[in-house]
């Protein structure tokens, strides 16, 4: 049933021009950054070749694309997640969905997986661009995989927060603004912290991605994203459960 809900949401997302416009915009930005970094690498290649231990294609070209993607997704995910529940609440179809023979958990997971599927497609496009470099150079596949995993987990966290905010209102625009504000707060929460071990650093979304961007997959960073995703999915379930009880 989760799969059926996810496929339905996937079709609805792609039925609107927004998903296509967003994907086209993402690919345009990613391609521009990719080609810009590739041009920089080609200009620096003589110096790189003469320097032992110099950074390679992955560090100079691929990693910056993933870094740029974090900022772009911060702005884009609120637009994709805003209608997941808010639109159904506004059009008054949410009571019909909740009265169907499916659990609230299945509804929430289905909607989340549909959005995550689109974000995974965006991450896959970046990976495909970076893999094209293997035709003319050598890539650090471990570093590439760590960046891709980190970006996917970060995008999943964005999606979970966006889904929860969409559960709170009947206005998609309000959900989008609220999601962006919440994500930005979690992004910048450590800006005033001086101690790397402080709670503000631990709670920062981008702080954990930086570990992945260096090629390290640490259990604490995996755990952070998975716990954050699970927390906001649980909050979404609790919110819709409360709505079902009131209905």
Task: Report residues per predicted region.
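Hydrophobic alpha-helical transmembrane segments of multi-pass membrane transport/permease proteins
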Residues: 17-41, 68-76, 181-185
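Hydrophobic alpha-helical transmembrane segments of polytopic membrane proteins
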Residues: 146-171, 228-233
């Amino acid at each position: 049933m989760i799969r059926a809900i996810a496929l339905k949401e996937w079709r609805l997302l792609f039925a609107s021009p927004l998903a296509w416009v967003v994907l086209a915009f993402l690919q345009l930005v990613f391609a521009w950054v990719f080609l810009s970094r590739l041009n920089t690498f080609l200009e620096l290649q003589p110096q790189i070749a003469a320097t032992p231990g110099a950074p390679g294609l992955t560090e100079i070209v691929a990693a910056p694309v993933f870094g740029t993607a974090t900022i772009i997704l911060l702005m884009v995910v609120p637009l994709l997640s805003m209608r997941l529940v808010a639109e159904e609440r506004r059009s008054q179809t949410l009571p019909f969905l909740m009265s169907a023979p499916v659990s609230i958990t299945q509804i929430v997971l289905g909607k989340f997986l549909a959005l995550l599927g689109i974000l995974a497609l965006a991450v896959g496009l970046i990976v495909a661009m970076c893999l094209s470099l293997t035709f003319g150079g050598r890539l650090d596949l471990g570093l590439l995989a760590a960046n891709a995993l980190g970006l996917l987990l970060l995008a999943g966290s964005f999606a979970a927060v966006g889904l929860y905010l969409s559960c709170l209102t009947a206005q998609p625009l309000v959900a989008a603004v609220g999601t962006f504000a919440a994500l930005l707060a979690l992004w910048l929460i450590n800006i005033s912290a001086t101690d790397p071990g402080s709670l503000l650093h631990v709670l920062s979304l981008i702080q954990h991605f930086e570990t992945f961007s260096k090629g390290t997959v640490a259990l604490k960073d995996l755990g952070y994203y998975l716990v954050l995703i699970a927390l906001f999915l649980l909050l979404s379930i609790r919110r819709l459960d409360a709505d079902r009880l009131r209905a």
